[in-house]
Regions:
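Long terminal segments
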Residues: 2-8, 12-47, 53-55, 61-64, ...
């Protein structure tokens, strides 16, 4: 289940982009697709979730699994704060420990600066969700 949520929320990063987007892992393998209507698909185009324009992330059954607030606060489905996204791309957990980084070019890095994915043309805040729901 945790792996499912990780993939779902990583894919949700791109959901509100103008057109469908591909999400890639560190080796540039496609791990999913996002349609312009907010439908999230895995690499085989199977629907695994949805994203609403208000930042609510849902699984394929429309159960809410998380929220991204406008101020950068990240919450789980029960609205418990699980972390923070700083404007410079630094991702912090609820205890303010660094979890990772999102670069302006779409590169996603872990806390040790190892590349773990690529999300071109996607807002940094959405890319940062990966760290909270994996």
């Amino acid at each position: 289940m945790r792996r499912f949520l990780t993939l779902l929320l990583f894919l949700a990063l791109a959901a509100l982009s103008a057109s469908a987007q591909m999400v890639q892992d560190a080796s540039y393998r496609v791990v999913g697709h996002i349609k312009s209507d907010g439908t999230i698909q895995d690499a085989s185009y199977r629907v695994i979730g949805h994203i609403a324009s208000n930042g609510t992330i849902q699984d394929a059954s429309y159960r809410t699994v998380g929220h991204l607030e406008r101020n950068g606060t990240v919450e789980d489905a029960s609205y418990r704060i699980v972390g923070h996204i700083k404007p410079d791309g630094v991702i912090l957990d609820s205890s303010y420990r660094i979890l990772g980084h999102v670069k302006t070019d779409g590169t996603v890095q872990d806390a040790s600066y190892r590349v773990i994915g690529h999300v071109k043309g996607i807002p940094m805040e959405w890319a940062a969700l990966y760290f909270f729901f994996r």
